[in-house]
Amino acid sequence: MAENNLQCSSVVDGNFEEVPRETAIQFKPPLYRQRYQFVKNLVDQHEPKKVADLGCGDTSLLRLLKVNPCIELLVGVDINEDKLRWRGDSLAPFMGDFLKPRDLNLTITLYHGSVVERDSRLLGFDLITCIELIEHLDSGDLARFPEVVFGYLSPSMIVISTPNSEFNPLFPSVTLRDSDHKFEWTRMEFQTWALYVANRYDYSVEFTGVGEPPAGAENVGYCTQIGIFHKNGGKATEACVSEQHDQHVYKAVFTTSYPSLQQERFFKLVLVNEVSQQVESLRVSHLPRRKEQDGERGDKPKDIGGSKAPVSCFGPVFTEVEKAKIENSPKPFCVGDKFFVPLQRLLAYPRLNRLCANEEMMRSVIADSIPLSSDGSAVVADLCNYFDEQFEF
């Protein structure tokens, strides 16, 4: 539940008109961004594949996490169906995602439902986040919350954040930070609850927070308190998860999938494009050398590669090891007016080597899109073309 950052970065929800500008506490970055960045840092550190955000609201956290390359399944759950439908499109792939596909598949799904209902589609997750959620639960739902999230879903890691009520006296005219909050806990109250839940469901927990207090008020602690729960022994095995009976109580209101290199058609597009660009770069770099040969022609292959790998001021920067690998690979050559680039040469370039494991794989993917030599060992291109004459290479 992100706070609006209006006249300052105050965390006081809905009370901006009551907070004098000169006395309002400012957080830079705004507190909601600090919370989301905290989660993102955890994702960067632990690299979970399956992540769910319970009480996802306007999907701000999901939009931040979707760019992380390790995540393959991203789920949001919220009780407000209209908000999910309104914000769903912001999670869809953009044109740039098709031009530069991810390495791994990514599916994003938004579910309408209550966080205290059991849905088997959220079993087996690596990380579940509950950011500023539990304070919105009434006593009955709060009692059921651990049973569902810790007991039934039982992910590897759970992150729960909630307001620290000890910080509230630093805000003018504030008792609860949001009119929908059912409670706000002190650090002792939150930690007592968290330790009890962790012990009952076999988790360990550590405490931290975001939103540092102003000088002289360090004793109140962070404005937002955070508990990080780790499942002892890791998450449930796939076999255990599959034994659970299917329970689909949530309503899927939005789902989308991102293009990735795991999908054959996108992998081919990327590889063909990378090969074409590298061949063109090599061809253009050798045109001046070719002109120095005074128009000499013949069927005998001419090694025009030189001893050094070409380095463009606008191109990638290679390490010494990468340069050596390129220099030691088979060099481009000419036969008549044709320019040949061995596949082994292309595989020496880091970007292409990352895409293709070997020559046979590269040949099988590009063969019907890029001209190859008769033995299939090299890409063939015209040495000169119309544009070379126009731009006087």
Describe every region a protein language model picked out.
Residues 2-31:
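Class I SAM-dependent transferase core
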Residues 4-15, 60, 79-125, 129, ...:
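S-adenosyl-L-methionine-dependent methyltransferase catalytic module, highlighting the catalytic core
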Residues 30-49, 64:
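Conserved alpha-helix/loop element of class I SAM-dependent methyltransferases that forms part
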Residues 48-57:
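Conserved class I S-adenosyl-L-methionine
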Residues 387-393:
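Phospho-regulated, low-complexity intrinsically disordered regions of nuclear gene-regulatory
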